[in-house]
């Protein structure tokens, strides 16, 4: 009879190796009791009592974390158990996939953000999930569509380890047949679970044989129980029934010891390495490739244009101020000139109104008024009539017409004195 794990480390770490495992499965699998038995302490609490008044209400899907420091003779592990409470307990469980997948990807996002920083945080806590224990209900026929879809989605982001809960419900032959059906369904649906990889060129023969034996045990058939001493004084995890006692950590009864060895001793580092080098790198590649270069270039061009516009605003701010001041000054001058012109136009219009209101004829038949003359004197204009224009000799502009008139008068007098009437138009 196997009393414990086969793999024993050479030394134990004082702080314990960090391990983060997620547990998903319906409440009918009794996964809480199994996890408590693996950790040898009470971590998860199963709901043994159900309120009849709330039995018809769907349970809320919750993701809860529990920490436990597990120290035994063979290992020391700083364990974090992530429980998906209420998984698969609803009538419609379609939204459960997205909740779990979003949680797994969120842990990758945190690592990606920290990795892209120029100055990284030395105290950054890696929260990526190293393994997911998917508990399968002991139906005995085949995997449900829900189980197949769940493992297919989760296997893209984490190491999925299928586990049969409450395996004590099967006989030895029934359990073997159920395992064969599960592995056949996984293969037909191309669902990749943790397959205990080995390298024939690097790994020793003993390691290869152990990995093959563990792979043949998948899915692991386990149950939960309580610890008590047997007749020989060994601490055993048992589950008592009326027909007898089911020894959980007996390899002849269940795969409990194999699962415990895989998680805490033999494959702990391998699980963490595959999480970082395979699942995280695949997610990182998908995340960066989804950001198309065209969108990235457009966003960069937009940012550059915004920066250029800001620079132009800062550089040309003074020029716009000077231009605006010059425009204001020109507008002021224009307003002054416009106001002056408007005043003159008002005066001229007032003159026209006065002329039309009170018209008088002078001795030459011209229309003159005192107001007209007064307004003309105010604006500096000289108003004369056509009849008095030839008789004006004071102005230099009238010198040419006055001289011409005198010559014509003298010529007329000469023609009359010599009786040259043909030159006089009024004698023809």
From Swiss-Prot:
Top-rank taxon of the source lineage equals: Eukaryota
Region (G1 motif), start-end ranges: 25-32
Could you provide one GO biological process annotation from this protein's UniProt record? protein localization
Q: Indicate the quaternary assembly.
A: Component of the sporulation-specific septin complex composed of at least spn2, spn5, spn6 and spn7.
Q: Where is the composition biased (Polar residues)?
A: 290-307, 326-339, 392-405
Annotated region (Disordered) at 287-345, 387-414
Region entry G3 motif: which residue ranges? Answer: 83-86
The region called G4 motif is annotated at 165-168
Q: Which species is this record about?
A: Schizosaccharomyces pombe (strain 972 / ATCC 24843)
Q: Where does GTP bind?
A: 25-32, 86, 166-174, 224
Domain (Septin-type G) ranges: 15-290
- Record membrane topology: Peripheral membrane protein
Task: Give the InterPro entries listed for this entry.
Answer: G_SEPTIN_dom (IPR030379), P-loop_NTPase (IPR027417), Septin (IPR016491)
User: Example GO molecular function term?
Assistant: GTPase activity
Q: Briefly state the protein's biological role.
A: Septin-like protein involved in the correct orientation of forespore membrane extension during sporulation. Binds phosphatidylinositol 4-phosphate.
Q: Where is the composition biased (Basic and acidic residues)?
A: 309-325
* Localization of this protein: Cytoplasm; Nucleus; Forespore membrane
| Protein name per the record | Septin homolog spn7
Cellular component per GO, a single term: nucleus
Family the entry assigns:
Belongs to the TRAFAC class TrmE-Era-EngA-EngB-Septin-like GTPase superfamily. Septin GTPase family.
Give coiled-coil spans as residue ranges: none
